[in-house]
Amino acid sequence: MSIVITRIILTFSILIMSFTNGAIAKDRVVPDNPQPFEEWVADLKTEALGKGISESVFEAAFQDITPDPKVIKLDRHQPEFTQTYFDYISKRVSQTRIKNGLKKVAENADDLAAVEDKIGVQQRFIAGIWGMETNYGGYTGGYNVIKSLATLAYDMRRPTYFRSQLLGALKILEEGHITPENFKGSWAGAMGQGQFMPTSFFAYAYDFDGDAKKDIWTNQKDVYASIANYLKKHGWESNRTWGRQVRLPQDIDGLWEKVKQTGKVKSCRRALKDHSIQLSLPEWQALGVRTIYGADLPKVTDPDFTASLVMPAGKDGPAFLTYKNFRAILSYNCSNYYALGVSLLSDELK
């Protein structure tokens, strides 16, 4: 009798172990690259040194670096879900974020004002992106940027893109903008309080205080100036706002038929495909569009000042006329929800 029981227990234990090991194997995430990681790093080192990275910087950056399974899993299994406009805005333009933002803007008023004066982007928009990206610097990411980018470049899903970002990250270390131990960011390699990728860092990061470092992690002047410089280089107009919520005429379907796009959207298609054609404010006025309070639209006669209509929740939701500055925000993140979140948050941070 005891022999039979022992055999049953043993068989059951084997089944459990088989199931558990199978589940672990199924859940295990490994890089999709047949080349050993050490060989891949050696090839990368040759390329990096050829691009001006010193051996000492490379060795320090890659000390104890191995592929990060968590990063691979996050990259391969990013959640796909549909979030409504109202859910998105209620979470990202919450009263808590507004209250915290007003406090942060007050605490950093001198730095924000100095950046606005020099670069020409209003403080509230700098703060809007700062708040949306990292909750005003509250969380910038705790991943080793070199480890994350090396993992993603080695994984071969988007090797060209992430290899260029990795080489850019090494250049950041080479130029001394930050030390290896403090080089932290998101799992995808976005860095600092404005969440710049390395290539964006070199295109837009700004050394505002002249200390030869573009410190987008801890230097608030550099943080604000870098965000502002990004917007300015994407066409920001310092004497304009982002747009406005508007009231549409009763025949919304008829209006949309007149103003919908029929041509091909060339840039930021994911967001701009949902926009109308661009018209002047007098043209929108003639089509029956009014301010949200029912008043006439501003009497702007500049022919270069145009606006496009977007209804992020469909014709039964809010409608917005968006100006050129809205497109500058879209260049930061090509999402109407994101750009409206920044815009509406900025309105609360005046």
How does the language model describe each region?
Residues 9-18:
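Bacterial N-terminal signal peptides
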Residues 249-252, 256-350:
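C-terminal soluble interaction/assembly domains
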Residues 26-119:
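An acidic, Gly/Ser/Thr/Pro-rich helix-cap/linker signature
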Residues 85-228, 232, 242:
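Acidic/His-rich structured neighborhood in mature extracellular/periplasmic domains
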Residues 31, 40-43, 47-50, 55-64, ...:
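A contiguous strand-loop segment
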Residues 1-9:
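Bacterial N-terminal signal peptides that target proteins for export
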Residues 21-25:
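Sec/Tat signal peptide C-region and signal peptidase I cleavage site
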Residues 213-273, 279:
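Ligand-binding pocket segment of bilobal, Venus flytrap-like solute-binding proteins
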